[in-house]
Curated annotation (Swiss-Prot):
<dbReference type="GO" id="GO:0005768">
    <property type="term" value="C:endosome"/>
</dbReference>
<keyword id="KW-0067">ATP-binding</keyword>
<feature type="binding site">
    <location>
        <begin position="281"/>
        <end position="282"/>
    </location>
    <ligand>
        <name>ATP</name>
    </ligand>
</feature>
<feature type="region of interest" description="Important for interaction with membranes">
    <location>
        <begin position="171"/>
        <end position="184"/>
    </location>
</feature>
<dbReference type="GO" id="GO:0005802">
    <property type="term" value="C:trans-Golgi network"/>
</dbReference>
<keyword id="KW-0472">Membrane</keyword>
<feature type="binding site">
    <location>
        <position position="158"/>
    </location>
    <ligand>
        <name>ATP</name>
    </ligand>
</feature>
<keyword id="KW-0256">Endoplasmic reticulum</keyword>
<dbReference type="GO" id="GO:0046854">
    <property type="term" value="P:phosphatidylinositol phosphate biosynthetic process"/>
</dbReference>
<dbReference type="GO" id="GO:0031901">
    <property type="term" value="C:early endosome membrane"/>
</dbReference>
<protein>
    <recommendedName>
        <fullName>Phosphatidylinositol 4-kinase type 2-beta</fullName>
        <ecNumber>2.7.1.67</ecNumber>
    </recommendedName>
</protein>
<dbReference type="InterPro" id="IPR000403">
    <property type="entry name" value="PI3/4_kinase_cat_dom"/>
</dbReference>
<keyword id="KW-0418">Kinase</keyword>
<keyword id="KW-0333">Golgi apparatus</keyword>
<feature type="region of interest" description="Activation loop">
    <location>
        <begin position="356"/>
        <end position="376"/>
    </location>
</feature>
<feature type="region of interest" description="Important for substrate binding">
    <location>
        <begin position="163"/>
        <end position="165"/>
    </location>
</feature>
<keyword id="KW-0963">Cytoplasm</keyword>
Length: 495
C-alpha cells in the first residue's frame, strides 16, 4: 500500500493502539500531510490491539494486513472521553501518551484504561531490560508469565501462533495427538487458532453481564526472545541487525530490526489464588461453615453463567481458581496446607473469590456433536445442585431478557473477532447463534428457579438470525430470529 512522503525518518517506530470498549471510532489525520489512500477512520474493536505505522513504514512479512498510519500526537481530554485520538508527527508524542516500547521500536498506546496501560508499559520495560517472559510448563500450548522490571509476575500472555493447534506451538503434545489419533485431533465445533480472541471475548461478556469473575484480558502485541519463533524469523532478525551494524544506510530502511511482535491475549495475573481442585478436595473432608458456603455460591453461579453463555468447551476443576481471604488471620495464605480447616470457624467474615481463567476454547460455531461432549466439570459439584440465588437472578435477568442488550453484545464481539485476518462473517454468525441459544436457555432457567445442573441438561438450542425479519436497531425475538433445537449428540455424551 503506497502513501505520500512525510517529514518523519524512515526508521520511525510503528505503533500499537489498544482500543477501549467504550471507544466508538478512531479518527486519523495529519495537520500537513494527508494520508492517501488510507481510510480516515476505523471503528474501534473492543479490547483488541490495532497496529499503526508511520508513513515511511513498509510491510515486510507476507500475509500481514497492517494499516500504515501516522504516529499519534497529543490528545485532548474531550478526545479521550469520546474514545478518539488525532494522529500527528509531533516530536512530543512519547510524552503525551500512556505508552511503552519494545525492543524493535514498536509501541503499545492504550486509551481510556490507565491501569492496564501502566501494566503493559511495565511489561515492555521489563523485556527491554532483559527480564523476559517465562514459558509456563503446564498446558498444551505456548503461554508465558509476563513480568515487570523487578521480576514480579503481572500477566499471562498467550500468543496466537503458539496456541494448541498453532504452527509454532512449542509443546509436542498436540503434534503427537495429530499424528497418532488424527480422527480426534482438534475440536470440530471451534474456529481453529482463535483462542486469543476467545480469551478476550470471555472478558468482554463477563464485563457486559457484570459478573466480575474473569481477570481483565485484552488482545495486544508483544515481542520477546523467549517466545517460540521459526528459524527463518530468527535468521532474518540476525541479518537485519548485521546489516544495520555494517551498512547503516541499508539497515535504516527496515522498519523492524528485531523479531516480529506476536498478537495474543494478555490476562492480568491474579495473586493469592489456587486451583479450584485444591480447595474442593478440602471442602469434601471438612465442609465450610454456612456463611462461608453462601459466599462461595454467589461467584460460583457467576462462573456457571459465564461458561454456559460462551459455551466453554474446556472447563475442568484445574482451570478456574479460588482465593480464600480472612480479615482476621493472614496465616491461611502463609501456612497453606498446614492450616487446619477445623480452625476456620474461629475466623470472622472470610472472603472467597473465584477467577475464571483459560477461556480460550469457547464460542463454538455449533454445539459439540462429534466425538466428545466437552462437559462442564463444575456440574458434578454440590454447588451445582443449589438453585440460582435471587441475587444472581436480579443481576442477570434484566440484561439477558432484553434482545437489544444481546444485540449490543453480539456487535461488540463482532468488532473484536473481525480483527483476526482469518475472520469469516458467516462462521461468526453461527457462533452468535449458539450463544443466543445458550442465553435463551439461561433466561428460562433463571425464571424457573432451576439449578446449574438442570440448566446444562436443558435441550440445546440455536437461535439464528432471520434475514427476512426486522433489520432495524430495535430487535424483537418474534420477527428477527428463529429458534431450532440441536438434537444430534456426541458419541461420548455426559448427560
Amino acid at each position: 500500500m503506497e502513501q505520500k512522503q512525510t517529514t518523519e525518518p524512515r526508521d520511525s517506530p510503528p505503533l500499537l493502539v489498544l482500543l477501549d470498549p467504550a471507544a466508538e471510532q478512531l479518527e486519523v489525520s495529519a495537520p500537513h500531510t494527508p494520508l492517501s489512500p488510507q481510510p480516515q477512520s476505523a471503528r474501534a474493536a473492543p479490547g483488541s490491539a490495532v497496529r499503526f505505522f508511520c508513513d515511511s513504514a513498509r510491510e515486510e512479512e507476507a500475509g500481514e494486513d497492517e494499516p500504515l498510519l501516522k504516529k499519534p500526537g497529543p490528545m485532548s481530554p474531550r478526545a479521550v472521553r469520546k474514545g478518539r485520538t488525532r494522529l500527528s508527527s509531533s516530536s512530543d508524542d512519547r510524552e503525551n501518551m500512556s505508552s511503552g516500547h519494545v525492543e524493535n521500536g514498536e509501541y503499545n498506546v492504550i486509551l481510556n484504561d490507565p491501569e492496564f496501560a501502566d501494566i503493559i508499559h511495565r511489561a515492555e520495560q521489563a523485556i527491554e531490560s532483559g527480564v523476559f517472559p517465562e514459558r509456563i510448563s503446564q498446558g498444551s500450548s505456548g503461554s508465558y508469565f509476563v513480568k515487570d522490571p523487578k521480576g514480579k509476575i503481572i500477566g499471562v500472555f498467550k500468543p496466537k501462533s503458539e496456541e494448541p493447534y498453532g504452527h509454532l506451538n512449542p509443546k509436542w503434545t498436540k503434534y503427537f495427538h495429530k499424528i497418532c489419533c488424527p480422527c480426534c485431533f482438534g475440536r470440530g465445533c471451534l474456529v481453529p487458532n482463535q483462542g486469543y480472541l476467545s480469551e478476550a471475548g470471555a472478558y468482554l461478556v463477563d464485563e457486559k453481564l457484570g459478573l466480575g469473575v474473569v481477570p481483565k484480558t485484552k488482545a495486544v502485541w508483544l515481542v520477546s526472545e523467549t517466545f517460540n519463533y521459526s528459524a527463518i524469523d530468527r535468521a532474518k532478525s540476525r541479518g537485519k541487525k548485521y546489516a544495520l551494524e555494517k551498512v547503516p544506510k541499508v539497515g535504516k530502511k527496515f522498519h523492524r530490526i528485531g523479531l516480529p511482535p506476536k498478537v495474543g491475549s494478555f490476562q492480568l495475573f491474579v495473586d493469592g489464588y489456587k486451583e479450584a481442585d485444591y480447595w474442593l478436595r478440602k471442602f469434601e473432608t471438612d465442609p465450610l461453615p454456612e456463611n462461608t458456603r453462601k459466599q462461595l455460591q454467589s461467584p460460583f453461579e457467576k462462573l456457571v453463567i459465564l461458561d454456559y453463555v460462551i459455551r466453554n468447551t474446556d472447563r475442568g476443576n484445574d482451570n478456574w481458581l479460588i482465593r480464600y481471604d480472612s480479615q482476621d488471620d493472614d496465616e491461611l495464605s502463609e501456612k497453606g496446607d498446614s492450616f487446619p480447616l477445623k480452625d476456620w470457624k474461629e475466623i470472622k467474615e472470610p472472603i472467597i473469590k473465584i477467577a475464571a481463567i483459560d477461556n480460550g476454547l469457547a464460542f463454538p460455531f455449533k454445539h459439540p456433536d462429534e466425538w466428545r461432549a466437552y462437559p462442564f466439570h463444575w456440574a458434578w459439584l454440590p454447588q451445582a445442585k443449589v438453585p440460582f440465588s435471587q441475587e444472581t437472578r436480579d443481576l442477570i435477568l434484566p440484561r439477558i431478557s432484553d434482545m437489544n442488550f444481546i444485540q449490543d453484545l453480539c456487535e461488540d464481539l463482532y468488532e473484536l473477532f473481525k480483527t483476526d485476518k482469518g475472520f469469516d462473517k458467516d462462521t461468526f454468525e453461527k457462533q452468535m447463534s449458539v450463544m443466543r441459544g445458550q442465553i435463551l436457555n439461561l433466561t428460562q432457567a433463571l425464571k424457573d428457579g432451576k439449578t446449574p445442573i438442570q440448566l446444562v441438561q436443558m435441550p440445546r438450542v440455536v437461535v439464528e438470525r432471520s434475514y427476512s425479519g426486522s433489520q432495524g436497531r430495535i430487535v424483537q425475538m418474534s420477527n428477527a430470529f428463529t429458534q431450532t433445537f440441536h438434537c444430534r449428540k456426541p458419541f461420548f455424551s455426559s448427560w
